[in-house]
Amino acid sequence: MGEPTALAERALEQVPDLDAAIDELATPSRVLSRVARPRPRPQEGPLESMMDVAAGGASAPPADPERVLEDGRRAAMKVRASADPQHVTLTLDEQVGLEAVILLFGRPALLVQHGTFPTPPAGWEALDAERPRIEHSIRSVGRIELLNRGMVGTGFLVAPDLVMTNRHVAEVFSLPADGGGWTFKLGRTPVIDYIDERDAITSATYKITAVAGIHTDVRIDLALLRVEANPIGVVPAGWTTPAVLPVSGTPPVIGDGEHHVYVVGYPATDNQGVTPPDVMMRIFGDVYEVKRLQPGTMTAISATLPRFSHDCSTLGGNSGSCVVDLQTHQVIGLHFSGGYRESNYAVALWKLADDPLLRDAGVQFV
């Protein structure tokens, strides 16, 4: 098998009791609603090819989840037991099942409900240990949408009246104004809702009043939006405006091992058809545009550009999401690009600590 089984070995290496972990996690509902596609490092492409096999094309009959997971259990045990995992021989069914098992222990995309997240999959117990601080971050991330038009992206609070998002998100509803600055397009009324969770019956919506600035450097996909201090409409009982997220003004301290981060955002369905429909359904359970916690690792920091890459599970709709350091819970990045068969990229915000646009707008670096 070569690289696919090597990737599987790496994905499963943090799971000491593999058989028990599969028994605990491998139910169809959990596969669909609690985990998402793992994001391999840029040079590790075989997992995507395995997913193509699993998708099976538009005419493929739906797979039996129990059979797929049993095939995956058998394949995972073969990989675990082999002295040479890269040369393990697997049947086609075992290859498909192995991908499903990897998803259980790979990069999850956990649904946020009532401001918190479910028990994470095996290998991500660190999220539970950091739960209170992660929940604090979750509250300050919202879904940017247009009244009567739907979602356009994600944003997060970086000052009491300031939301950060991507340039390409802001440009959906704004355009350059005569004499400088930016103005809203006719008929576009942007707002941000800090809840928008699955099955939520309440909202916490704030009007976006102005574009404070859009970065002129084409390498920096960043925009800043002014928001009103008080919500519009009815909010949940006891609701208070979310806290400002601390933005790191210094580089993350990278040790010898993986450097864990997490994204909070609103992944949306792939309307461009890049991701096979069967893959989207199997991984996300047809649940999109709601708040999710998406942990992963930093994979590279550019030496020449103000950006870094990460392997959190993201889709369209995550544009404008914060990338938070799991050690410090400070925002280190602004996610701006990524998806099926792509690397994930974020603006390295610590490199902009002295940037005039961010400084003058009031971004609070720490």
Spans of features found by a protein language model:
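Serine endopeptidase catalytic core focused on the charge-relay Asp
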Residues: 121, 132-152, 156-316, 324-327, ...
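C-terminal subregion of chymotrypsin/trypsin-like serine protease catalytic domains
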Residues: 2-28, 37, 41, 300-308, ...
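Protease-domain processing segments flanking chymotrypsin-fold serine proteases, especially trypsin-like
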Residues: 1-153, 290-297
